Amino acid sequence: MAAVKRIVVLPGDHIGREVVEEAVKVLGAVEQSLSDVHFDFQYHLVGGAAIDATGSALPDEALGAAKEADAVLLGAVGGPKWQGGAVRPEQGLLKLRQELGVYANLRPCNFAADSLLELSPLRPEIARDTDIMVVRELLGGSYFGERHEDEGDGVAWDTDKYTVKEVQRIARMAGFLALQHDPPLPVWSLDKANVLASSRLWRKTVEETFQSEFPNVQLQHQLIDSAAMILVKNPRAFNGVVVTSNMFGDIISDEASVIPGSLGLLPSASLASLPDSKSAFGLYEPCHGSAPDLPAGKANPIGCILSAAMMLKLSLNMVAAGEAVEQAVQEVLDSGVRTGDLLGSSSTSEVGDAIALAVKEALRRQSAAGLS
């Protein structure tokens, strides 16, 4: 009997709907190639689409389904239509993350195919072999701290608050990921400990956690502003795992995202626990936004497709299938089937079609070699 994997699909707004469709198409190709798995896709509204239909950016029905799922696949939320309202699409995404307890946001920065090197804004000799995993704390800091809006007095403030437990668990995620390699990957912790009290607690806690629990992992600390400079000057200096707070992680991962040539390429996973059993609950979404100005058929679906690959590897205990998707993406990019952001002429669906076909062939090769 085939194992049922329940996946809640939240397309969201604008290009979110398009890229999710292609990721589901690729997952469908995986299912068609394997006899022992069935994907149960359950679609729900989130973001602006949910506001229009229900008045809420995250309807109770969608949240309830997400909590019962094995994993959640999300497209993108937001757009100018909803920015002036009392309820904003982004509120739904923040609530979803908080309610699901996904405290660790994993954002890889690497080249999905070597042929993309020429598209990097950095010189090839600088960008080549960049391979960074940014681990962003997702449920603390200024995005969730106490705040005061300007109410006519000309004053507004946010609170960047962290507890030892919050820092410990994200440090453990970074240490765990480092230990998945032999030898262990180095870990860089980014903070602003020369100015911020929260960063001093961060640095102290990360240091103590690694000393007691990950003594064989090389840990280095770097101030966030100098890290931003180094990332452009010599990104390979951070090859390994980079762990940092919510706001700093948001910024540094977006900076890193341009290195491979397009934000549309990069996936992300937000996990509620260590993926030590390859079955951690996770929320998966591309790093890009909803791009409301982009015409239909122009969006790059690869970031969402690679997010689905991460889901297979980290939440659905289907590591070989996830690797097959990654291999298919590489082959399709190398063949020249690309969207306009990568100087190609293929549509969103054409890229998805090509990757789905390549996935079937990659899984056939795995089966022939006895690897699946």
From Swiss-Prot:
Q: Where in the cell is it found?
A: Cytoplasm
EC annotation? 1.1.1.85
Q: Which GO terms describe its cellular component?
A: cytosol
Its pathway, per UniProt, is: Amino-acid biosynthesis; L-leucine biosynthesis; L-leucine from 3-methyl-2-oxobutanoate: step 3/4
Q: Name one GO biological process term.
A: L-leucine biosynthetic process
Pfam families membership: Iso_dh
Q: Which residues carry the site feature described as Important for catalysis?
A: Y143, K192
One MF term in GO for this entry? magnesium ion binding
Record field: catalytic activity: (2R,3S)-3-isopropylmalate + NAD(+) = 4-methyl-2-oxopentanoate + CO2 + NADH
- Where does this protein hold substrate? R97, R107, R136, D225
Q: Which domain of life is it from?
A: Eukaryota
Enzyme class of the recorded protein, top EC level: oxidoreductase
| Chain residues that bind Mg(2+) | D225, D250, D254
**Which keywords label this protein?**
Amino-acid biosynthesis, Branched-chain amino acid biosynthesis, Cytoplasm, Leucine biosynthesis, Magnesium, Manganese, Metal-binding, NAD, Oxidoreductase
- InterPro entries tied to this protein: IsoCit/isopropylmalate_DH_CS, IsoPropMal-DH-like_dom, Isopropylmalate_DH
Give the cofactor note text: Binds 1 Mg(2+) or Mn(2+) ion per subunit.
**Cofactor needs:** Mg(2+); Mn(2+)
Name the job this protein performs: Catalyzes the oxidation of 3-carboxy-2-hydroxy-4-methylpentanoate (3-isopropylmalate) to 3-carboxy-4-methyl-2-oxopentanoate. The product decarboxylates to 4-methyl-2 oxopentanoate.
Q: How does it assemble?
A: Homodimer.
Q: Which family does it belong to?
A: Belongs to the isocitrate and isopropylmalate dehydrogenases family.
Descriptive protein name = 3-isopropylmalate dehydrogenase
> What organism is recorded for this protein?
Eremothecium gossypii (strain ATCC 10895 / CBS 109.51 / FGSC 9923 / NRRL Y-1056)
